[in-house]
């Protein structure tokens, strides 16, 4: 059986949580492989609503192993809080069903402070739209080879040396920003406080996953955010600090690339974005407002209102290529119910010429204008549909046209936040 990687095919918030939860029924292990607690997702199971940010979605499913891989940056205090929150909802979290890579990078208080200060000090038009949770600064320390990693908490005798190495960078940086230096003792106290709460979950994740792979276990890799926020392939610099494309499932978990298997991209039937950056199909009118209101487009973690626009087939086709997507899960089709006409971006105009890809240049990205194809909407409802027969004819035409434009089949269709309201075309674990 193939393993499955789930990645966002837009700018995040595509509904990955529901799809991962749906797929986790057939998975043995669910792995988070990048990002941090900056990308929240909501799971609706029966009458219970779970809001997760760091824990893999499989944690709410009994009998599943959840894994946080080395590609994640981990805020240990947030982890403790999130475990406590879902435990209060009746979810059992123990070292038996949650494993964290021993070489995962930790987010510290100084990372959060630095992140918030930088974003607040940014001038208008340059703000990245960070969640101010320390994700970027933690990744900077990781690639700068000065990060504190989870395994370091298990070696307190050498911790001071590692903190000093970290502060050798942060002290002059903070002085330049007008911030007070952080005493070594404060960081040590922060780490000593949380160490006994998180160390029991530590494991050599790469070895554990390789053993599971050899034993024929089904592994589901859960991406955070979306491919258009990838630090290399996204709308740079308005991106996140990690690689969000499917290939990072291997690097961020410690497995080889052959372990990835089927790649499922998640895309809304329209487009949303949080924070700054280019958005060719963004709507500033009543239609955009209607999409946002009907889709409840507010961030799970931040509560920020999301920008809304029509489906951009050019961008999704691009992420199909850069992530090697085999099939798409199309979500929130029901939000388009009742629109008399629906537009889809099929190309761009750049300086008077038509182009069929999104340019890498920030200046060129700002100059493109969308070329739309207008389709007839539908008066019937798709909400709660669980088979093609329940969909209006025009809704089916819309889905089929999207498949043609993005050059990938729709494997799953989601028609509400409820897990059961899903139309299965291809099972990624079986087909």
Swiss-Prot record:
Cofactor (UniProt): Mg(2+)
**What's the chief localization of this chain?**
cytoplasm
> How is its cofactor bound, per UniProt?
Binds 1 Mg(2+) ion per subunit.
Q: Which Gene3D superfamilies match?
A: Adenylosuccinate Synthetase, subunit A, domain 1, Adenylosuccinate Synthetase, subunit A, domain 2, Adenylosuccinate Synthetase, subunit A, domain 3
* Subcellular localization, as worded in the UniProt entry: Cytoplasm
Q: In which pathway does it act?
A: Purine metabolism; AMP biosynthesis via de novo pathway; AMP from IMP: step 1/2
> In which family does this protein belong, per the annotation?
Belongs to the adenylosuccinate synthetase family.
Q: Where does the record place the catalytic residues?
A: 13 (proton acceptor), 41 (proton donor)
Q: What is this protein called?
A: Adenylosuccinate synthetase
Catalytically driven reaction(s): IMP + L-aspartate + GTP = N(6)-(1,2-dicarboxyethyl)-AMP + GDP + phosphate + 2 H(+)
Keywords recorded for this protein, A-Z: Cytoplasm, GTP-binding, Ligase, Magnesium, Metal-binding, Nucleotide-binding, Purine biosynthesis
Task: Report the function annotation for this chain.
Answer: Plays an important role in the de novo pathway of purine nucleotide biosynthesis. Catalyzes the first committed step in the biosynthesis of AMP from IMP.
Binding sites annotated in the UniProt record for substrate: 300-306
Q: How does it assemble?
A: Homodimer.
What top-level class of enzyme does the UniProt entry assign?
ligase
Annotated Mg(2+) binding sites: 13, 40
Q: Which gene encodes it?
A: purA
Q: What is the taxonomic lineage of the source species? A: Bacteria, Pseudomonadati, Pseudomonadota, Alphaproteobacteria, Hyphomicrobiales
HAMAP family hit by this protein:
Adenylosucc_synth
Any one GO BP annotation for this protein: 'de novo' AMP biosynthetic process
